[in-house]
Amino acid sequence: MINYLILRFLWLRERGFVQITQKTLVSLFPFFLISGIIRVISLSVFSEMGYINQLFSVSDWLPTFKITGQVLINLSNFLGGLAGPLSTYFAGKYTAGHYGRSTGTAGVTSLLVSLIIGSQELLLSPLNDDGVLARINLPDSINIILAIFVGYLVGQIFRFSRASDDQIVDKDYIYQPKTVRPIFLSLILAIGLNILLVIGDQANVFQTIRKFTSTFTVTDNHLLSTFMMGLLNTFSAWIGNNQVFTPNSIAEDSFALENLTYAVSHHTTTGLPHLYTLTNLYHSYGMVAGIGSGLALLVALLLASTSYKDKKVSLLSVFPSLFNYGAPFMVGIPVLLNLVYLVPFLLAPMVNMGIAAVSLAIHLMPAAVYPVPDGTPSLLYAFIGTGGSLRALAISILCLGVDILIFIPFVRLSNKVQHGLKEEGESLETK
């Protein structure tokens, strides 16, 4: 069975789109790493409700606290907004290169296509009063895989054009007008997709889709609904939805707000109206090691991986991952769309939630009902949310240990897949 899986994974890794996707994700790693470090510092240190600021009162003794925080959060949002355009750029570049076309021209064209698609007001809104066009958006919520697919389409346009069509200048530095063809077709694609998005937004198509998908998580059983929402959120991260990496507020969970009101008014967490909330189970324990228990995978890779690259990425990603921002790690390995890690990625958070649900049912620990500061390390979320319960902290550590044990067999499977890829590469070189 294991050998069959390895052969299937090897076959999948040889597909062109998979190779392009993995190259793109790995290329995004340094940008995500820098953005992640800046984001963690801005939220945890330079935010009024930040975890480090609450501990050391940074805002009281640092004169430049507010301006530094504003600069850092703006820079982080800017880099985060570039995730979509950069994904499309690298995907277009690597697709064109995969088929022997000009990588530079395809990459820049893909970048322009991404900016046009993501700026719905660009083609429909007038210029500002001063004549400045300021309608280009860098959305903070994108699906990385969709952005990669758009770049892949642009790369295919360059692929099916003639080789001479993507040369801007020849060897004598003379401009070649034929390069207009693939660029023009790519821009037509961008405008068409932009118009479709505008029409879909005006017709409430996307709102209808969101309502439809939400019905899968609504059941009469509150505990089951919480598990379903946690599973859907985790799977959404695995397919590249970067919105799930945004810090969650207790204000977004109406049941958690009811619990908080009850705890404050009754001075106890006993007899809460909603014991199994998304905040109490998923955010506190399902994400005790980050989205998909990424921190546990990071530790498992450091312990069991034979890949120097994976260990290096893991070490570089430790800081943001500790503070519940695992996006750099997920693109650097990559974990996104990696079938080897799909099962543990989905399973580990569900196991954590199961452990927490049982512990709450037998009153082994109190419920996490209190607000948690921004940028709090994921391992301490339940500890702070329960008002400092050592039993909740012990359960959190237990969940992390269980997650590491879940991931280790899959890390060893990944070692075998990478070894197989290396052997195939060496055999091709000797032919």
Language-model segments: which ranges?
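Hydrophobic, membrane-inserted alpha-helices
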Residues: 85-91, 230-232, 296-297, 323-331
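Juxtamembrane non-transmembrane "cap" segments at the membrane-aqueous interface
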Residues: 250-263, 351-377
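Juxtamembrane membrane-water interface segments that cap and precede transmembrane helices
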Residues: 58-69, 268-276
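Juxtamembrane inter-helical linkers in multi-pass membrane proteins
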Residues: 2-7, 56-60, 167-179, 254-270, ...
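A cytosolic-side transmembrane-helix exit/cap motif
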Residues: 124-132, 226, 267, 333-337, ...
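Signature of multi-pass transmembrane helix bundles
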Residues: 1-50, 63-64, 68-238, 242, ...
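Membrane-embedded translocation segments of transport machinery
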Residues: 160, 194-210, 219-303
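Hydrophobic alpha-helical bundle architecture
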Residues: 95-98, 279-284, 298-366, 384-393
